[in-house]
């Protein structure tokens, strides 16, 4: 809720700082960009006259920006994302790696999602903030490429990892008796995800160029802009269109279908055997909570990234012109998605909260001797989620379904539900 309120405050204030179309602004822009002796205002060391013409056509990209109030608001908004994203995602990785009971393929996917969020938080979000506040790129040519790569690669890794998690949960619920994905296969899937994300991100990273120009008599500025090969307009348009369809729309459709089927299965499944009224309503509450969590995953992923993806697609298609206020508001909103994933996938998980509390209690006080510790009333992960490291089900007699249930083809939701809430 807080990030959404910050976005509502951020957009009108930043929009108010956009340069007006008045005569004075037009004269200053033309004076800086269209004088006969253009070499006085532009670095010609590595560029051609066509580069200069393209740059002039995009001159509004680096408009003078922001009064002190808006700059302060931007710093607070982006700092909020950076702090919460780093804290939440690093904590997720630490808790999972620290606890042997949480080592599984699904946990690997969650860690992979956290790593992608950490990458974009460190390699893109701070640089975008500084660029907007200072109205110039100060990090050099190398980071111009790295920052763009981090943004696209993190987005693609997140989308593909969310898809892998959705498919994994779908298999668990729809086919509860089949073996889970092993850790070895999980590592292979993650390697494939990063390979695909790198392949689709490299064109965006390579086709970046650092333009340097003299903004005024005393100010020299640099801009990190896309610079695609000819025909540049078509290359840019179809690259963004392919990225939007293959790595946003398609994963979102797969996630939606998988979770819709899971939700239907959980909602229609009845607990097998005699149950009391209290047990029935408790099961119903668990069903609703699980369905809400699954739908929240889809909605947040779609909402956070749709504005920025749609804006970039329209911009590359020349349907709209560059607008700093919209771009940075949409960019901030997309970056805020890195704060939600730890809560959705881990902190809403009861078993993860138990592990987190145990970890925090160990940091606050020394552990008691082993013989003084009472047996834990909390069931182990392996009781509800019985799998070996090779993905095979452990032969626990207590977890085997009766023969009548196996022959009926029904799913005992009391054994399936804990798997959903932990994965």
Curated annotation (Swiss-Prot):
Glycan attachment positions: 37, 46, 134
Topology of the protein relative to the lipid bilayer: Multi-pass membrane protein
InterPro entries for this protein: GPCR_Rhodpsn, GPCR_Rhodpsn_7TM, NPY_rcpt
Alphabetic keyword roster: Cell membrane, Disulfide bond, G-protein coupled receptor, Glycoprotein, Membrane, Receptor, Signal, Transducer, Transmembrane, Transmembrane helix
Biased composition (Polar residues): 402-414
Presence of keyword Signal: yes
Localization per record: Cell membrane
Disulfide pattern: 144-224
Role this protein plays: G-protein coupled receptor for PEN, a neuropeptide produced from the precursor protein, proSAAS (encoded by PCSK1N). Acts through a G(i)- and G(q)-alpha-alpha-mediated pathway in response to PEN. Plays a role in food intake and body weight regulation. May contribute to the regulation of anxiety-related behaviors.
Protein name according to UniProt: G-protein coupled receptor 83
